[in-house]
């Protein structure tokens, strides 16, 4: 079975399509579950401060399990790892449905998500190679963003109708993802026979961090993707603060619609990157990264809804064009040095650490009373400067 997969590297192979379907259902469940669980917290009269804590336990699972999930992904067939990880998500969602403390259930979902991520991206490099890997990443990102859009809306709409029905729908989505994983052919483990002692696994993970950081291309990818996803999460919270101030709109729906425009743009940008960027021309994505910051700063000055929608769509397009080639570069180079699973686990550690750091700085700015518009302008300028510095650094490294 594995041999047939290795010879059929088409991005439309049965194995690849199964991965994409499983990813869509799993990401759909993740996003629907967030809004359904938030509705449950409100219905059970949890305090307002508990809502960000729910996101923190999810992100915290990524950071806590980062030293171990990469080795797990590389030590077993990645399709089976994905199936078990989705099973953990299913157990967490089902537990919340049955009355388990929502923070406990959501933590279990976070552990499943942490284990799932290195396997889902690592398997792309085993099902296809070379320039097709960029296209496969584009498909993965497009399915993820589509799931984010549909899952977020479905979770909110169903929760308004019936909270338990929304939670059951999330569990069914995870069950569908488990079923889709069964159709992924069983591939040979990438790096079997590694030590399972916690000390050895931790040491191995941090050795992988060092190896990837010392390589100019993978260091470039790690920093770029970390900056992008950290900025993306911060922008989501910034919109909630910015909309009432800049647009005078106080409902809860408008920030959600604006976030949706970013997601739609990412799908378009990811598709463009798949056609226009190869592993040999990854640096083509860097101007898009700089422009993200520029457009965020311009967006922050808007006072009308239509230009805001258009600029956020553009931000998403630039973001998709920027991040997809960087993901593909890390998978290809990481697979050859530390294993794709370990490479993605290191990437997850960097991205989630960046999320916590940027959200912390954002919260500090809000706490000291910096206006929302000023935060947006400063955020955009700093992001553009950071990506420009990364590009200059990468070009200097390449010239040595």
UniProtKB/Swiss-Prot annotation:
Q: Which compartment or compartments is the protein found in? A: Cell inner membrane
Q: Which GO terms describe its molecular function?
A: lysophospholipid:sodium symporter activity
**Record's InterPro entries?**
LysoPLipid__transptr_LplT (IPR023727), MFS (IPR011701), MFS_trans_sf (IPR036259)
User: Which Pfam family is an annotated match for this chain, by its short name?
Assistant: MFS_1
The membrane-topology field of this record reads: Multi-pass membrane protein
Keyword set for this entry?
A: Cell inner membrane, Cell membrane, Lipid transport, Membrane, Transmembrane, Transmembrane helix, Transport
Name one cellular component (GO) term: plasma membrane
SUPFAM superfamilies linked to this entry: MFS general substrate transporter (SSF103473)
Question: PANTHER family, alphabetically?
Answer: MACROLIDE-EFFLUX PROTEIN, MAJOR FACILITATOR SUPERFAMILY (MFS) PROFILE DOMAIN-CONTAINING PROTEIN
The record's section on NCBIfam families has:
PRK11195.1 (NF008397)
Per the record, the similarity remark reads:
Belongs to the major facilitator superfamily. LplT (TC 2.A.1.42) family.
- Purpose: Catalyzes the facilitated diffusion of 2-acyl-glycero-3-phosphoethanolamine (2-acyl-GPE) into the cell.
State the name under which the record lists this protein. Lysophospholipid transporter LplT
Q: Which organism is it from?
A: Salmonella typhi
The organism's lineage? Bacteria, Pseudomonadati, Pseudomonadota, Gammaproteobacteria, Enterobacterales
């Amino acid at each position: 079975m594995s041999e047939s997969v290795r010879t059929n590297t088409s991005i439309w192979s049965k194995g690849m399509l199964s991965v994409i379907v499983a990813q869509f259902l799993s990401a759909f469940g993740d996003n629907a579950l967030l809004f359904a669980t938030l509705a449950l917290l409100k219905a059970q009269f949890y305090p307002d401060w508990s809502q960000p804590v729910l996101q923190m336990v999810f992100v915290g699972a990524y950071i806590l399990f980062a030293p171990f999930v990469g080795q797990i992904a590389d030590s077993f067939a990645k399709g089976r790892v994905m199936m078990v990880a989705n099973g953990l998500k299913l157990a967490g969602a089902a537990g919340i449905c049955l009355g388990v403390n929502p923070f406990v259930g959501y933590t279990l979902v976070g552990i499943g998500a942490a284990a799932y991520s290195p396997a889902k991206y690592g398997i792309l490099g085993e099902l296809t190679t070379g320039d097709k890997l960029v296209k496969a990443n584009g498909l993965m990102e497009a399915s993820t963003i589509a799931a984010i859009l549909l899952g977020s809306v479905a979770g909110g709409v169903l929760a308004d109708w019936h909270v338990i029905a929304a939670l059951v729908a999330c569990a069914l989505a995870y069950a569908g993802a488990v079923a889709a994983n069964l159709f992924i052919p069983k591939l040979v483990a990438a790096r079997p026979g590694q030590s399972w002692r916690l000390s050895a696994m931790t040491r191995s993970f941090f050795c992988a961090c060092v190896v990837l950081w010392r390589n100019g291309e993978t260091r470039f990818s790690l920093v770029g993707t970390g900056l992008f996803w950290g900025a993306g999460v911060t922008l989501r919270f910034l919109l909630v603060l910015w909309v009432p101030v800049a647009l005078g709109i106080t409902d809860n729906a408008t920030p959600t619609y604006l976030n949706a425009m970013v997601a739609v743009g990412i799908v378009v940008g990811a598709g463009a990157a798949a056609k226009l960027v190869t592993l040999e021309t990854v640096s083509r994505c860097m101007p898009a990264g700089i422009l993200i910051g520029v457009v965020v700063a311009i967006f922050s000055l808007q006072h009308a809804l239509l230009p805001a929608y258009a600029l956020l769509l553009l931000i998403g397009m630039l973001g998709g064009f920027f991040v997809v080639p960087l993901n593909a570069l890390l998978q290809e180079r990481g697979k050859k040095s530390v294993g794709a699973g370990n490479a993605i686990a290191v990437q997850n550690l960097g991205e989630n650490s960046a999320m916590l750091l940027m959200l912390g700085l954002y919260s500090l700015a809000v706490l000291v009373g910096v206006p929302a518009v000023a935060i947006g302008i400063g955020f955009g300028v700093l992001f553009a400067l950071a990506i420009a510095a990364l590009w200059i650094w990468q070009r200097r490294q390449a010239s040595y």
